[in-house]
Amino acid sequence: RLSLVGSEMCIRDRHKADSIHLDELPEDPQPIQADESFDDFIYNFASDDVLQRQRVKFPLPYYNGDKKANIEERNWKHDNLFTKQHYYTLLFDKEEDMDLVGDTSLTSVQVEWIFVKTRMMKKYYFERIKGAWILEAINLRPIERDENEDFVEFFGHFATDSLFQSQRVREPLAFVTTDPDDDFSVLETTLDLNQWFAFKPALPAERLSNINYGQRNDDGSPTKILALKGIGNGFSNILYFRRKAGEWELYKFEDVSI
């Protein structure tokens, strides 16, 4: 979970580290407290221009399909990633992979933008080098199509067309939410279609973000999980989809916002 309080402390810690290690070469940055968790790091990276420039390996390779360019530091524009939004999204093929979130042993993570209408993916490659996360490359490429109903294409339709959405929500829809009488337990129940439309979150239609901690995102997977995570506001919704007779359907909805 992205922690705003922790992030502010981390920014202060970074400035402290900067003053201690003035003799360090820029290409060998010192780790800060936020580097322990990639989620904490990426919030700091996107929020703090000074840190961002320290953590981009310039000249930065930028691949657009088969074309490669190098971005020099003087041409770098601060990238807010998803921090200007109220939430970001994560994609998984199976529930077990959600345990990778918060894993402090990771050394390679990719942040992805999936552009729904243009079917393009922009991927940022981060490596942890001597304890410090570094952006090493950016890659922009088309999303491949296959003969099955493509999840990104399906979700773009699902998010924007309520009639289509109503045809692709299983009834009854499994629903998991926080017990109002006990914050430490959850209620498992079901929703009908009208209740889904009353409880559902606003769905991202233009683009999806994803942080690839090492989970598989296989186009042929029969299941997909889309997690919507709030940035500093306790919002947490998870949508569970499966492919049935070749078509995607929403079969479970989880709202454990605090």
Spans of features found by a protein language model:
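Single conserved hydrophobic/aromatic residue that forms the stacking wall/gate
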Residues: 1-11
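Sec-dependent signal peptide cleavage junction
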Residues: 12-58, 62
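Coil residues (strongly favoring Ser/Thr
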Residues: 18-19, 80, 104, 162
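Short, well-ordered alpha-helical segments enriched in acidic and aromatic residues
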Residues: 40-47, 51-76, 164-179
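A structural feature that tracks compact, well-ordered secondary-structure segments
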Residues: 41, 59-61, 124-125, 154-157, ...
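Surface-exposed, charged secondary-structure patches
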Residues: 62-120, 183-235
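Short beta-strand edge/turn micro-motifs at domain boundaries
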Residues: 116-146, 234-258
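Surface-exposed beta-loop interaction hotspot
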Residues: 130-168, 172-187
